[in-house]
Amino acid sequence: GLLIFGMFVVMLYTATGRASWAIAGVGLAVAGAFIASKTLTYVGWRFANWLDAFNPEIIERSGGSYQLVQGIFGLAQGGLIGTGLGQGRPWLTPLSQSDYILPSLGEELGLIGVFAILCLYMVFVSRGIRIGLAGQDDFGKLLATGLAFTIALQVFIMVGGVTRVIPLTGLTTPFLAAGGSSLIANWLIVAILLRLSDGVRSSPRVVIG
């Protein structure tokens, strides 16, 4: 839900160029999250895991913050340059192959390796936005920009979740985590962006409407 809503707000801003839509979208997301945390039990637990992750009672309870804390310890263990490929202990963090793939990589590659991965994502997103800005029509512009920000939002939500910047959700890290449907969807995004980039090289821009 958060990913779809975020993509909708980004595409609305891209189509209109009005920052007020983006600000309103952020406000609605914050308000919706607050209301959900008070009315939905599982959302309230996720907020508790986020805000008080190191509380022993929350760590030990079912569905608690154990994996979040273990992921943070894994990132801390990696330090600046990491322990080396294959030298980490990903089995100490539950779901290290999917939701917590980034802490596992951070332990082995360190802060430098994590920054390198994030830079690759930034390059991918920036290229997608450039494809949209150079698009031959407004539909291509919205499609390319929306797809690029879909990847950006996934990365932000996952990186923010495992580092306690925001509450953790059930998304996977694009192209890294073991998630069948998610992985296929992200590679379809790559294919569509490549097709759009091929179409913007020779065609003049056409404005619809």
Which residues fall in each region the model found?
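Structural signature of hydrophobic alpha-helical transmembrane segments
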Residues: 1-5, 114-118, 183
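Hydrophobic transmembrane alpha-helices of multi-pass, membrane-embedded glycosylation machinery
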Residues: 2-12, 27-31, 122, 190-191
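Structural signal for the C-terminal ends of transmembrane alpha-helices
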Residues: 9-19, 36-37, 122-132, 193-200
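Hydrophobic, glycine- and aromatic-enriched re-entrant/interface helices and adjoining loop segments
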Residues: 19-116, 136-140
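Transmembrane helix-bundle signature of multi-pass membrane transporters/permeases
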Residues: 30, 92-93, 104-107, 147-151, ...
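Alpha-helical transmembrane segments of multi-pass membrane proteins
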Residues: 33-37, 120, 147-157, 191
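Loop-to-helix entry and N-terminal half of a specific, functionally important transmembrane alpha helix
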Residues: 131-170, 176
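A juxtamembrane structural motif centered on a specific transmembrane helix
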Residues: 157-209
